[in-house]
């Protein structure tokens, strides 16, 4: 079976982009949580807002907020 020799490199590059995007997302979630942005939109918590606005399940949303709160300020 012949495989594209650059396919592995493309996968690695895409994975790096996803991780960088996830870091930016978590950072922004931390800022939004600290500023209480969710409350201005009527949500009970940042996790509830993420669940409603972004479509995450409440469990994964809580995990993102938990991780965001652990990041250095």
Where are these regions (language model features)?
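Peripheral, non-cofactor segments flanking catalytic/redox cores
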Residues: 1-73
